[in-house]
């Protein structure tokens, strides 16, 4: 920004759009937003609280009463069939062990004994707080709903019964891949399998280029085999073409083909990319096999797996889910999958199928609600844009250093070379990116007084004037994906109808609705794709993630699932299985890196295009940047901060684990009185969320609920044993329980949040530039 509201430098979009609403500073919000929520009513976990009992005088009588209350609460949770059904989907091995046995004995009217009771009470309470207090987007315990932002002043309106409108089960990609590998081992199938070049390898000028290896000149026999590979021909067809070209013995051609496979240059077999229906992609490949005696048997085995996976969506109740998942496992065995290929995943809680659901809720958010976000959210997004630009500068400086170092050791540097040399930077950003985050917090400290001794309520117009100076416009955006950011916004509503927005997280340089789960559960997926196409009007360069890439799954991003047809370019850095729709991907070894006017450019000349290296690495940049948006560094106590009617920072506390007064042993303090006194002395409210080292997500704690305090004590105790200085973070629950607005037909309340997409008015200067003329050789083995 130049210091005057609305004035920007850089490349401004000229697109006139009706699919967005406008915010301050040129920012826009998609009109469609996802509603994420808890799957079980908040009242289920509220019933764990016994405030009146805890207020009684300490002593043995109170301790006995608390233990009796815990037993009754545990029994009530075990009897909750919906909770145990959620547990069966998430952790079937656990659900089918002591929870099932205990529930069966309760149902029979007995008073069952439970070994290791205190620990197991905490385990069940931990699952309960997740299903009741954490906003999710998975299964029926995190069913996806949708909201629409409209121009009318209608406040908050919603319709629907609040339950599940649609349930769909999907086969995991890894399970489909295990089936493919099993079918490939069927006698008589090998010569019918397709052969393709390793996605990151390239063949040009008589040389084979592989990642992390020097180029190798191939022999006449290898050349004949490689020339015959076009990504479609089968083993038998490749061998026939090679034999016709060389006149060599068939056994020699086969040996060379296998040698190239074992070296990693070639891949033989079915492609199973990440997709919501990987079994259908596999089926299409099997249907192309020419021999019906082989083809029909493979299809029958695959169809058995697909049918079992589809039927799992109809399972209701923990026992039925366990049975359905067992049927899927049996179908995998029947298809030839080994225990080694599937058991390891199952032992880590990865079921071969997953469930995604559409919640029976439709929300309308009126302009009178969104208008209150215009200035505060616009300021936050300005600082997110600044953050992304600074990260880009820091990462490119590191990439340039690596590129120059590589250039002293070879004649040309490929994208594969640079990615390997700068792997640490692309994975974490390194110290330079940490310094950018610190700079962000220092700049925000000019707006938010670090020494505040009470909650801050700031006026948006004053904050805007400061933000214009603190977060100036960086000029053209540095990579395409940084045009989109995803704020998670919670809405609180009091009994008298007053509302207040709360910022949960702001995901920088990432559209979190690109996850496949949102596309499959959207009523109109084309709307999401069309909005993406307009946001990415200049194109985008996207890596094709291998199946084993960290974080890559069929249901979440990466890989992206809102690709506008023909708009993106793709490149491959590992042995991926391609894009499901068959888009051509450029090998990383076929992209050479050059410095032009101080910027690194990747040229895929054999494919006819080039792009800035930051664009090639854009998805990695987004992964580095997405969670950096933290406005304040940790401190023992930080007060709540609002800009106009948006809470941008909730009240929070941080402590070394060794200073939290947890009992030395489980059950050593039935009422956890010292923990409650500690929280009260620190000024904490009754309802908080806590994050401890080793836990991926924060968890809910009610200081009036002994079972939830036991869960807190266990987590803190483990953290302190590992490192007494490990930091425990506590944040107020906001909206508070009495401000939850989402209800079902029975009036039960649920936690919820809106996942929105914000779009910058600025765009990249350029993404893809046409260079050269694609060569025939460059198309080999795509």
Locations of regions flagged by a protein language model:
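Hydrophobic residues embedded in beta-strands of well-ordered beta-sheets
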Residues: 207-208, 273, 599-602
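Catalytic cores of large soluble enzymes that bind and process phosphate-bearing ligands
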Residues: 217, 230, 387, 391
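C-terminal structured domains
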Residues: 493-725, 732-733, 744, 749-775
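Acidic, low-complexity/disordered tracts enriched in E/D and polar residues
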Residues: 124-228
């Amino acid at each position: 920004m130049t210091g005057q509201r609305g004035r920007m430098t850089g490349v401004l979009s000229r697109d006139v759009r009706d699919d967005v609403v406008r915010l301050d500073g040129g920012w826009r919000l998609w009109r469609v937003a996802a509603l994420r929520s808890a799957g079980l009513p908040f009242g289920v976990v509220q019933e764990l609280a016994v405030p009146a009992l805890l207020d009684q005088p300490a002593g043995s009588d109170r301790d006995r009463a608390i233990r009796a209350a815990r037993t009754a609460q545990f029994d009530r949770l075990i009897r909750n069939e919906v909770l145990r059904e959620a547990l069966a989907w998430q952790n079937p091995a656990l659900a089918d062990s002591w929870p099932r046995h205990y529930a069966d004995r309760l149902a029979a009217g007995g008073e069952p004994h439970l070994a290791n009771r205190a620990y197991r009470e905490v385990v069940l309470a931990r699952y309960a707080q997740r299903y009741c207090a954490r906003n999710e987007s998975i299964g029926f315990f995190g069913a996806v709903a949708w909201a629409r932002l409209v121009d009318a002043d209608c406040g908050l309106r919603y319709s629907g019964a609040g339950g599940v409108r649609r349930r769909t089960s999907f086969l995991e990609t890894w399970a489909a891949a295990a089936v493919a590998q099993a079918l490939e081992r069927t006698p008589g199938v090998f010569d019918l399998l397709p052969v393709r070049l390793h996605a990151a390898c390239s063949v040009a000028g008589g040389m084979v280029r592989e990642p992390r290896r020097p180029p190798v000149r191939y022999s006449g026999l290898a050349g004949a085999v490689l020339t015959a590979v076009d990504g479609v021909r089968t083993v038998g067809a490749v061998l026939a073409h090679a034999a016709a070209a060389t006149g060599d013995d068939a056994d020699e051609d086969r040996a060379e083909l296998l040698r190239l496979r074992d070296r990693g240059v070639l891949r033989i077999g079915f492609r199973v990319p990440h997709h919501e229906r990987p079994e259908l992609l596999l089926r299409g490949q099997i249907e192309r096999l020419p021999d019906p005696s082989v083809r029909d048997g493979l299809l029958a085995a695959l169809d058995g797996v697909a049918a079992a996976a589809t039927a799992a969506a109809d399972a209701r109740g923990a026992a039925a889910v366990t049975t359905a998942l067992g049927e899927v496992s049996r179908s995998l065995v029947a298809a030839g999958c080994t225990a080694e290929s599937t058991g390891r995943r199952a032992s880590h809680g990865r079921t071969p199928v997953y469930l995604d659901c559409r919640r029976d809720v439709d929300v309308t958010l009126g302009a009178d609600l969104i208008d209150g976000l215009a200035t505060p959210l616009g300021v936050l997004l300005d600082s997110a844009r600044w953050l992304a630009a600074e990260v880009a500068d820091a990462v490119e400086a590191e990439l340039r250093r690596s590129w120059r170092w590589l250039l002293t050791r070879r004649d040309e540097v490929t994208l594969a070379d640079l990615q390997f040399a700068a792997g640490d930077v692309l994975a974490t950003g390194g110290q330079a990116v940490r310094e950018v985050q610190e700079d962000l917090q220092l700049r925000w400290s000019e707006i938010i007084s670090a020494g505040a001794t009470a909650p801050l309520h700031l006026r948006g117009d004053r904050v805007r004037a400061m933000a214009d100076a603190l977060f100036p416009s960086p000029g053209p955006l540095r990579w395409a994906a940084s045009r989109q950011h995803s704020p998670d916004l919670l809405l609180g509503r009091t009994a008298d109808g007053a509302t207040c927005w709360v910022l949960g997280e702001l995901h920088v340089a990432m559209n979190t609705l690109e996850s496949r789960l949102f596309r499959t559960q959207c009523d109109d997926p084309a709307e999401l794709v069309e909005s993406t196409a307009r946001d990415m009007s200049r194109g985008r360069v996207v890596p094709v993630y291998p199946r084993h890439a960290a974080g890559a799954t069929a249901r979440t991003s990466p890989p992206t699932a809102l690709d506008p047809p023909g708009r993106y370019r793709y490149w491959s850095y590992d042995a991926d299985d391609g894009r499901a729709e068959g888009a051509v991907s450029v090998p990383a070894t076929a992209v050479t890196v050059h410095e032009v006017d101080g910027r690194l450019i990747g040229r895929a000349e054999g494919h006819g295009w080039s792009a800035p290296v930051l664009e090639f690495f854009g998805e990695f940049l987004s992964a580095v940047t997405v969670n950096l948006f933290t406005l304040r560094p940790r401190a023992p106590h930080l007060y709540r901060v609002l800009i106009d009617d948006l809470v941008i920072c909730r009240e929070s506390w941080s402590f070394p684990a060794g200073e939290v007064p947890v009992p030395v042993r489980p059950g050593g303090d039935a009422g956890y009185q010292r923990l409650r006194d500690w929280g009260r002395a620190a000024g904490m409210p009754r309802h908080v969320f806590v994050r401890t080292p080793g836990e991926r997500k924060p968890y809910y704690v009610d200081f009036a609920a002994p079972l939830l305090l036991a869960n807190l004590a266990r987590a803190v105790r483990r953290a302190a044993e590992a490192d007494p200085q490990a930091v425990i973070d506590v944040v107020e629950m906001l909206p508070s329980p009495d401000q939850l607005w989402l209800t079902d037909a029975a009036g039960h309340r649920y936690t919820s949040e809106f996942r929105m997409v914000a779009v910058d008015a600025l765009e990249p200067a350029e993404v893809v530039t046409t260079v050269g003329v694609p060569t025939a050789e460059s198309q080999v083995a795509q």
